[in-house]
Amino acid sequence: MAIHSLKDTNKTDLFRVMIYGKPGIGKTSAARFLKGKTLVVPFDNSEKVLSGTNIDAEEFDKANPSKELTRLLKELPGVLDGYSNLVLDNVSSLEKSWFIEQGRNSKSGIRNELQDYSGWTNYFIRVIDAFYKLPVNILVTAWEDQYEITSMTGQQFNQYSPQLRASVRSTFMGLTDVVGRMMLNPDTQKRGVILEGDDGIFAKNRLDSRKASPIETLFDWGESDDKDASAE
């Protein structure tokens, strides 16, 4: 057995955070507010919005995601020294690129085959698990979508959550410390992140007691007061 004491463990060390929202809401730009040196892996090649910042970006060939992910997971452990944060920018885009790649490699050259769907479930969880084992803080972004859920009372709702196939979405969100929906307040034009979920929005926060946060202070863990996210 490998027993270790949790007495001096800080639950915010090596955090794993996902923020999701509609395209253009500012998910990638949230990397500006991470503390320490940051490396971005741009699955959707949108890293140019971070131009002028002291943030590094890895090149990613979205036409060949399987090969690129194999390369990254082999090379990253050797280049992360000095980095505090890793940003996996847009796993929704990664999912789409992977299925396009599989369709291209199919017998028809375009259509996905049945085994692709079960293959993605195993592949994606293994990839995320490998990323999550890296000794840095990790921020993941995704697009949003609405999915039908059934409450404990039997009522059905459409709930916003990260745009990923159902076969991986729940497991992925379970592995992640914080899942928040980024929103824009139409009155103030300020961006915030919802950190407490309900029937209409999936969100969770197991790092502190905040239910919402302005994007600028999202990574200031330990705040006991619920700040106005300016997103409701």
Predicted regions and their residues:
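Conserved GTP-binding G-domain of TRAFAC-class P-loop NTPases and closely related GTPase folds
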Residues: 130, 146-232
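Residues that form or immediately flank small-molecule/cofactor binding pockets and catalytic motifs
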Residues: 45, 62-64, 143, 184, ...
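P-loop NTPase motor core
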Residues: 85, 90-170
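Short, well-ordered beta-strand core segments
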Residues: 38-40, 138, 179-181
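A short linear-motif detector with a strong N-terminal bias
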Residues: 10, 17-20, 36, 118-119, ...
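Structured loop/turn residues at beta-strand edges in well-structured enzyme cores
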Residues: 81, 134, 174
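Conserved P-loop
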Residues: 2-88, 92-97
